[in-house]
C-alpha cells in the first residue's frame, strides 16, 4: 500500500438525530452503540458498515477492511515488532488516517493470530485456524481446500471440506520449515530471502540433513567453509523447508483437496513450484493470500453484526 492509502478522508462526525432525515433507521445506529458516526458511513440513506480483520502474527501484522459486499477496501502489513500491544495501537492510528475511526464508526473488528489478545478495541478474538480457513475459501472461491500457511514462527496445514475445518496440523514448537528459518539461513548466506530463492533455482545436489534451525545453520556454515557453491546451499535450504512442509502434509488423514499457499511466502513463485513438485499436485496462490487470516477475521466480524 502506498502512502496515499492512509491520507485522511476528512470525514465529518454527525449525531444520530442529524442522520434520521437521510432515511437511516436510528434504532439500528443505537443497536451498534453509536452516538456519533462519520457522515460518510451513509450514502443516499444507506447505512454502510466497515468490517475490520487484524491478524497479528509473530513477524508481521496484517489488517484488512471489508465493505458489506465483502470487497477489500483497505489492506496493509507492517512488522509486529517486540510488542503486540504497540502494534495494535499503530494499526488503530493507521485506520484513523484511512478515515476509519473505531470510536465513532459503526464498524466491527475481529482480531486473530499470535497477538490477538493484544487488540483491546477488537469486538472479538478468533483463532487463526478458523480465520485462515475462512479467508482461504473466500480468496480461492473453493469450499474444499488444503491450506499451507508458512508463517514467521509456525507452519499450519489446514484441511477444509465444504467450507469448514476438518483437520489441521500446526508446527509451533520448532522454527524449522518456517519463515524465520529461511530468514536465518538467508542472513547466513549474506542474502535477502528473495535473493536466496532466485539463487536456489540455479542450484542442486546438496542437502541439509538437520531440521533444527541452529544445527541447520551450522551445516550451512560448514558447507560455506568447504567451498560449496552458494546456489547449491540456497537450494538445500529451500529444499529442507519443502521437505518439512511435505512431511506435515503427509500426516493429514484422507485425500488432499486443492492445495493453496498462504502466508508471507505466497508471492514466492519458486516456493510454490517446489511445493507443487514435491506434493505431486499444483499448489495455487494469490497476491492477497498473505492477508488470508485478516480476511477471515473481517469475515468473522460480519457474523457478529
Can you say where each PLM-predicted feature lies in the sequence?
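Glycine-rich phosphate-binding loop of actin/hexokinase-like ATP-binding domains
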Residues: 128-188, 285
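Glycine-rich phosphate-binding/hydrolytic loop that grips phosphoryl groups
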Residues: 134, 179-183, 286-305
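Glycine-rich phosphate-binding loop plus the immediately following alpha-helix
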Residues: 84, 162-208, 212, 299
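Glycine-rich phosphate-binding loops at beta-strand->alpha-helix junctions
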Residues: 114, 249-278, 289-293
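Short glycine-rich, Thr/Ser-proximal phosphate-binding strand/loop in the N-terminal lobe
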Residues: 51-90, 165-174
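Phosphate/pyrophosphate-binding loops at sites that engage ATP/ADP/AMP, CoA/4′-phosphopantetheine
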Residues: 92-107, 245-257
Amino acid at each position: 500500500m502506498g502512502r496515499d492509502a492512509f491520507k485522511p478522508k476528512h470525514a465529518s462526525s454527525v449525531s444520530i438525530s442529524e442522520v434520521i432525515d437521510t432515511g437511516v433507521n436510528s434504532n439500528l445506529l443505537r443497536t451498534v452503540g453509536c452516538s456519533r458516526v462519520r457522515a460518510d458511513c451513509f450514502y443516499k440513506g444507506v447505512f454502510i458498515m466497515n468490517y475490520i480483520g487484524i491478524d497479528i502474527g509473530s513477524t508481521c501484522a496484517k489488517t484488512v477492511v471489508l465493505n458489506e459486499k465483502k470487497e477489500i477496501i483497505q489492506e496493509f502489513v507492517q512488522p509486529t515488532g517486540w510488542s503486540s500491544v504497540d502494534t495494535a495501537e499503530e494499526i488503530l492510528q493507521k485506520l484513523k488516517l484511512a478515515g476509519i475511526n473505531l470510536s465513532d464508526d459503526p464498524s466491527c473488528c475481529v482480531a486473530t493470530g499470535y497477538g490477538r489478545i493484544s487488540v483491546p478495541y477488537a469486538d472479538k478474538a478468533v483463532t487463526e485456524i478458523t480465520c485462515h480457513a475462512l479467508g482461504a475459501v473466500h480468496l480461492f472461491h473453493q469450499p474444499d481446500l488444503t491450506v499451507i500457511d508458512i508463517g514467521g514462527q509456525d507452519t499450519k496445514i489446514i484441511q477444509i471440506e465444504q467450507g469448514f475445518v476438518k483437520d489441521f496440523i500446526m508446527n509451533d514448537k520448532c522454527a524449522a520449515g518456517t519463515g524465520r528459518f529461511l530468514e536465518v539461513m538467508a542472513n547466513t548466506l549474506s542474502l535477502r530471502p528473495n535473493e536466496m530463492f532466485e539463487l536456489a533455482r540455479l542450484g542442486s545436489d546438496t542437502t541439509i540433513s538437520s531440521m533444527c534451525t541452529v544445527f541447520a545453520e551450522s551445516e550451512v556454515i560448514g558447507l560455506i567453509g568447504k567451498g560449496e557453491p552458494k546456489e547449491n546451499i540456497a537450494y538445500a535450504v529451500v529444499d529442507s523447508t519443502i521437505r518439512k512442509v511435505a512431511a506435515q502434509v503427509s500426516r493429514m488423514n484422507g485425500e488432499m483437496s486443492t492445495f493453496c499457499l498462504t502466508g508471507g511466502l505466497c508471492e514466492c513463485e519458486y516456493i510454490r513450484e517446489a511445493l507443487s513438485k514435491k506434493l505431486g499436485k499444483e499448489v495455487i496462490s494469490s497476491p492477497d493470500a498473505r492477508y488470508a487470516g485478516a480476511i477471515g477475521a473481517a469475515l468473522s466480524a460480519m457474523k457478529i453484526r
